[in-house]
Amino acid sequence: MKSTVLLKEEIKEKGVGSWRPDYYRALGYSSTSHEDNARQRADAIYTLFAKPTPHIFKNDLIVGSIHDMMVDLDEETGRFSSETCSRYPERNFGTNADHYAPDYETVLREGIPGMFRRIESSKKVHGKEESRLHFLEAMETALSGLKARLLRYADHCMELRGEKGYDEGRLDWIASNCRQAAQGVPETFAQALQLVWMIHTCFVCEGRYAMALGRIDQYLYPFFRRDLDSGILTAEFAGELLENTFIKIYEYRVCKGSDDVVNICIGGCSPDGSSDVNELSYLVLEAVGNCATPGPNLSARISKNTPDTFLDACLRVIGTGIGYPALMNDEVNIEALRRYGCYEEEDIYNYSMVGCIENFITGKQPPWNDGRFDTPRFFEYLFNRGVSYDGESRGIDTGNVSDISSMAELMGKFERQIAEGVRLYMERFWARNRQEHPEELTMPFLSCFCAGCIEKGLDINMGGSKYPSAHGAAVMGIGTVCDSLAAIEKTVFTEKTTTLEELRDAMIADFKGYERLRALLLEAPKYGNNDDFVDKYAVWYVHFLSEEFRKYHTPDGGCIYIAIAANTSNISAGGGIGATPDGRLAKAPLSDAASPTYGRDVNGPTAVVLSVSKPDYGQVACGTVLNQKFSPGMFADGKREKLAALIRVYFARGGQEMQINATSRDILKDAMEHPEQYSDLVVRVSGFSAYYVTLNRAVQEDILNRTQQG
């Protein structure tokens, strides 16, 4: 829509100053009279939300901007702000700070006044417990900051009346919506969307990243339906409101120089199996497509009962080249959460995604975190008696490979190496998350939007949430590992064209002088071609790693899930790993996520989905990523049906996720050579989309080298 285009141009004007939310926090910290950490933080949160002068764009319909965090400070004030805030360290991604889907459904149902009433009720229950009472007061103060921010925006609308370029009727309407969102319960679709967006901008101002908007087509639908039926809203205007909101995610790039990953989840199914797709699902899809920016990161839950028209609508948007929505298999994700979690059925069916593809129990568990587990590294320890080829890292000594007489024996020793790696990974995880004084790292505002925290008077990371935290171990290189094991089995134990000792020497030499052996390894069966000789190792890989990590728990008793996702880390991970038995050279990227190694899946997309769907992804509660690249012509009328049928087959066989780039190798190569001509080219990277020309060369080449299907 025209208003979206105009708003995007406004957003691009960065203005003066630099990103300094610490300035507003410091105002609260320096004036607080409280001695406990929670209320000190709350005072800083209040000034962060309430003190900045609101930034309202001329083409705004839904307000809430992070431009008001751009401040032009003199050197002394800037130093004072930094030093003041440094005395109050914050949690980070590794210690559960963000990657969270808030409980927007509850706040829309009861409004900010209802949240205040719940806090008051809880204060009466916990009045004799000082720490809980203080935390409830901190939540109250933080929530007051949100209310003040909404009212400041309403007042600023009045101040802008008569200013050039501002529509007075629109300003009055926005002000009315902000006041209702601040002082009552949202009554209209616009007011509900306004409240959600203002809360989201508050999270960004706090410094939180990858804060999801959750199942927006579900919690906004009652407002949409009621307004539509009463005649005060049209579907067209609802779509414009959504676009007006989503395009502001682009502000993050303007203000901070990088893209935020704001996941929105649409579709899905109910416990009775019926589809949750509604009219708003289509409008969200259309709005995101019209924005044509790297965010939001749209995810579509696809079940066996999802209408074909909805899947087709998803493919139409993917076909524009923006790389989303990512398509999620609802049945597999629900089964995985049921199998690995401790969650009630109702909450499982209301799951959404945070960050890239991570499954999350919406609004009822602490923020997500994950880490990287580089599985191919353990070949070095296996072949070199527990020492990496460069001598920089160590596993366990499982003996000389010359003593291994069978594939089964080799697998047993390889499993021992991986199991030790899992143990060390969890040891590091626990050390990072073992907080000596967690009460000094409280999050009173975020805790307001998690079920259980208000009632218990506890922080989201200190037992307040309904469920414990979950951690994801992103296991790298399934394609590299499977191809390597198949190559070992074929060349060493089946055809006996080499020995494990020769293979070890070849890998240490990075195959220099062993070119013939490398050629034999490259000729072995490869993952992604529907060949059980190699695919059986994918089945083993998923099962073994999930069972190993399942032995451990988070500090608060939650589960350790595996993720078969890379988020471009396959490139950096490969950079620190020597040559592998599949013929991969040292420092080359590992295979990406759940995808076959690029260029080795030579039998077409059907063979790929048949291979990738063989493991039991009900063991992968975090999620997987299968990257596929199809030519733009595959998305034309009359051809999308074939692609939809392929996806249905993949999901029916147990595949968990698929995301698609609709582009060609020629376009990507030309963009690398002439970036100035492709500033708006959006591609799917891994679990997110980005402007292609802003990516570093290694990531650009990784996307370029993905197998072109169709």
Region locations from a protein language model:
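Conserved catalytic cores of very large enzyme subunits
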Residues: 1-139, 163-165, 169-710
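Extended non-globular scaffold/tether segments
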Residues: 137-149
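Amphipathic alpha-helices that form helix-helix packing interfaces
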Residues: 146, 150-153, 174, 488
